Amino acid sequence: MSEEKARVDNAATGDIQHQGKDIFFAAVETTRMPMIVTDPNRADNPIIFSNRAFLEMTGYSSEEIIGTNCRFLQGPETDRAVVQSIREAIDERVDISTEILNYRKDGSTFWNALFISPVYNDAGDLIYFFASQLDISRRRDAEDALRQAQKMEALGQLTGGIAHDFNNLLQVMGGYIDLIGSAAEKPTIDVQRVQRSVHHAKSAVERASTLTKQLLAFARKQKLQGRVLNLNGLVSSTEPLIERTFGPHVTIETDLDPALKNCRIDPTQAEVALLNIFINARDALVGRPDPKISIETRNLVVDELANMSYDGLLPGRYVSIAITDNGIGMPSSIRDRVMDPFFTTKEEGKGSGLGLSMVYGFAKQSGGAARIYTEEGVGTTLRLYFPVDEAMLTHAEPPKAVDRRIGSCERILIVEDRPDVAELAKMVLDDYGYICEIVLNAREALKKFESGSRYDLLFTDLIMPGGMNGVMLAREVRRRYPKIKVLLTTGYAESSIERTDIGGSEFDVVSKPCMPQDLARKVRQVLDGPNGIA
């Protein structure tokens, strides 16, 4: 915006009535663009002039608005932040251009493209504020319609992809379970055949679990177990994975910054993200002469001026890792969609279209960003950014093996609205030496306690029908019995336990699906913990 101030002739006094013959105001009066002038030297900065276009746009008469402040255009849905920015610009005597939802006299709304500028006389005195306006409702409606259409297209692609992949997995699980059932009815059991069926069914379950984690990663809803690590170390630890992914015919180069700062991310999800990038790079290299991959790490400072160049990263210090291939690259039409869930250019069965969307979601949920640079026929670079963490490196201990009989006959109340899920949890925990009872909702659970039953652990689902969720139940039971241990479970992974409308961060949680040994380990940790938080 130019620093040159708008000026009028020194004869201008601030009284618009004396300027009726001025060619400027004659032009303003006849233009089709709505315009008003206000007087900042009078109390409440009132309107002192409006042209016919403004009156037609708002439905008011000149007599109704002259001498009043412009706030009559505001209504209940007007953005207060935009109003505040306008006030600040007026206080600071600077130009402002914005879009605001305004109200006509009849109560109907319109989107107003507003430009306000101070006007000075030759002596440098502020005498007016000049505001030009434009009804842009049609443009905003068209933009909203386009966004809705795009959202519905994305939703259709997402739900179609989910249904396709889960139907395939359900086919595998159901088919092999039927084979196991048929084998159990025969007088002699082919143990190897049953074991193969069990293996394939479990493999399908694991793939389904991976699919939900990828979806949650894209939506930034997965539960991340962040710890301090160095990306250089992450690259070194995944070298065997890199070599297996690309094979001996691909040249792998690394350029790792020896002074690279640490970051705090989930190491398991980070490895999965890198694997997804490696797989896409490998597929892009098929048939290319002299295929090559380079891996680079760097420190980076993002300032306020540059943050939009880094996908809106907050100003601060970051570390980055970039994977570059000299593969086929992508046209812009594919580049712009490559991180959408279930978008894939691969043939059926070769990819789910969730790999890079998982990478994007993981980076975002970790406080960073993922950016892709590509040129068709030249290659692709995918760069991840994570905030610097000055804490020292930590090393996670491997989980200890779980004894098949780790329970000591502790009593557990299982609260789960799905009977099949509840029965499975009971069978698992019974096998580990616990005494379990099942109820299907929170009200039944409270009745159990009120009848005098005593339990060492309340194991409850988080989301349940009936008006009382798992957190509400846990808090009520803990209020009555402060020493009871509590473990929540949810299929929603991360944010249902931390959403402000549910809460519950004071309790430990185990995510579904959960392997029997993992559930047993978590139950033991909670029971042995001082306050039920492992």
UniProtKB/Swiss-Prot annotation:
Annotated Response regulatory domain residues: 411-527
Reactions accelerated catalytically: ATP + protein L-histidine = ADP + protein N-phospho-L-histidine
Single GO molecular function: phosphorelay sensor kinase activity
Domain Histidine kinase: 161-390
All copies of domain PAS, residue ranges: 20-93
Residue ranges of domain PAC in the record: 94-148
Modification type 4-aspartylphosphate: residues: 461
Ranges in coiled-coil conformation: none
Post-translational modification: FMN binds covalently to cysteine after exposure to blue light and this bond is spontaneously broken in the dark.
Modified residues (Phosphohistidine): 164
Keywords (A to Z) from UniProt: ATP-binding, Chromophore, Flavoprotein, FMN, Kinase, Nucleotide-binding, Phosphoprotein, Photoreceptor protein, Receptor, Sensory transduction, Transferase, Virulence
Stored CDD domains: HisKA (cd00082), PAS (cd00130), REC_hyHK_blue-like (cd18161)
E.C. no: 2.7.13.3
SUPFAM superfamilies found in the cross-reference section: ATPase domain of HSP90 chaperone/DNA topoisomerase II/histidine kinase, CheY-like, Homodimeric domain of signal transducing histidine kinase, PYP-like sensor domain (PAS domain)
Modification S-4a-FMN cysteine, positions: 70
Described purpose of this protein according to its UniProt entry: Photosensitive kinase and response regulator that is involved in increased bacterial virulence upon exposure to light.
Name of protein: Blue-light-activated protein
